[in-house]
């Protein structure tokens, strides 16, 4: 989603994990804004994350929670780098590395799994660390850019990886994914190389 927003906003506030039924604490961050109408957009976004976590933890301290602030000005650079990286991953698939990548994917936590509602979204760094062997220098560049893009991030200690942004990596139901991707989610014009990798995988 973040790749579609840089023309429209400075920051994106989003959760990697499913959000609880409690939802966002609007009175919290709106109260902060009312008390300080001169707040910068980045500070408003951080307040959203803080107030969300406070409200959700108060409701259930053992919940699966995450919320991040993404600096959208960095996302176009990140996208270009991921596109280059994806070409290396497709080459790895063509060279017989499907079993390696598939095993790595099965070890990743798909967000929503705790509620049996997985959407094949995994943590960005979990994906990068699992595949960096195929293009280590490019992976290091991506990691540096990614760390810059994550302006702020909070979450509970329920995850092996929770670094601020998720990425779609199809799991066991690849054929089902391809059908739904074609019909509903294909935005390949934004990231053709990554789309090619997911189809090939």
Locate each region found by the language model.
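Terminal, contiguous helix-loop blocks that mediate binding/assembly
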Residues: 1-201
